[in-house]
C-alpha cells in the first residue's frame, strides 16, 4: 500500500430486524430455541463467535455430490464402515426386526448378555 492512498468509508446502515410476539413460551419447544420459523439455525461457540446457517445453504450442502461420497482413506471396520463378511446388510438389519416372544423376559427385563456355565 502506498502512503498516499486514501480510505473511503461506507455509510452505516441498520441491521434489519423483525419482532415476533410470543405468548407464554408454549409456541417454542425446548428443541427449537436455536431455529427460526424460516429454518435458519444459529448458535455460538464457547469463544462467543456467532454461527448462522441458512436453510437454503444447508439444503444445498445436503444435496451436493460431496455429501454423497464417502471420505477417502476410511478404515475398513466390518459392521461399521463396511458390511460384515458373514451376512449381507439387508439380512442383518431385518434380523433385529423379527424377534420372537420367547426372546423377551416377562416384566420387561432382558438379560444384558448370555453366559454358558
Swiss-Prot record:
It is found in: Cytoplasm; Nucleus. The modification Phosphoserine is found at residues 43, 64, 82, 95, 99-100, 111. Its main location: cytoplasm. A motif (TOS motif) lies at residues 113-117. The modification N-acetylserine is found at residue 2. InterPro entries: EIF4EBP (IPR008606). A motif (YXXXXLphi motif) lies at residues 53-59. Phosphorylated on serine and threonine residues in response to insulin, EGF and PDGF. Phosphorylation at Thr-36, Thr-45, Ser-64 and Thr-69, corresponding to the hyperphosphorylated form, is regulated by mTORC1 and abolishes binding to EIF4E. The modification Phosphothreonine is found at residues 36, 40, 45, 49, 69, 76. Residues 99-108 have a biased composition (Basic and acidic residues). Expressed in all tissues examined; highest levels in fat and skeletal tissue, lowest levels in kidney. Coiled coil: none annotated. Residues 1-47, 64-117 are annotated as: Disordered. One of its GO terms (cellular component) is protein-containing complex. One of its GO terms (molecular function) is eukaryotic initiation factor 4E binding. It holds the Pfam family eIF_4EBP. The TOS motif mediates interaction with RPTOR, leading to promote phosphorylation by mTORC1 complex. Hypophosphorylated EIF4EBP1 competes with EIF4G1/EIF4G3 to interact with EIF4E; insulin stimulated MAP-kinase (MAPK1 and MAPK3) or mTORC1 phosphorylation of EIF4EBP1 causes dissociation of the complex allowing EIF4G1/EIF4G3 to bind and consequent initiation of translation. Interacts (via TOS motif) with RPTOR; promoting phosphorylation by mTORC1. Belongs to the eIF4E-binding protein family. Repressor of translation initiation that regulates EIF4E activity by preventing its assembly into the eIF4F complex: hypophosphorylated form competes with EIF4G1/EIF4G3 and strongly binds to EIF4E, leading to repress translation. In contrast, hyperphosphorylated form dissociates from EIF4E, allowing interaction between EIF4G1/EIF4G3 and EIF4E, leading to initiation of translation. Mediates the regulation of protein translation by hormones, growth factors and other stimuli that signal through the MAP kinase and mTORC1 pathways. This is Eukaryotic translation initiation factor 4E-binding protein 1. It comes from Rattus norvegicus (Rat).
Amino acid at each position: 500500500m502506498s502512503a498516499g492512498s486514501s480510505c473511503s468509508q461506507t455509510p452505516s446502515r441498520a441491521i434489519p430486524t423483525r419482532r415476533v410476539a410470543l405468548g407464554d413460551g408454549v409456541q417454542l419447544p425446548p428443541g427449537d430455541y436455536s431455529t427460526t420459523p424460516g429454518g435458519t439455525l444459529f448458535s455460538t461457540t464457547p469463544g462467543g463467535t456467532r454461527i448462522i446457517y441458512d436453510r437454503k445453504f444447508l439444503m444445498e450442502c445436503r444435496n451436493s455430490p460431496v455429501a454423497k461420497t464417502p471420505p477417502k482413506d476410511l478404515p475398513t471396520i466390518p459392521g461399521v464402515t463396511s458390511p460384515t463378511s458373514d451376512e449381507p446388510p439387508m439380512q442383518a438389519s431385518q434380523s433385529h426386526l423379527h424377534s420372537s416372544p420367547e426372546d423377551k423376559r416377562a416384566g420387561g427385563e432382558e438379560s444384558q448378555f448370555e453366559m454358558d456355565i
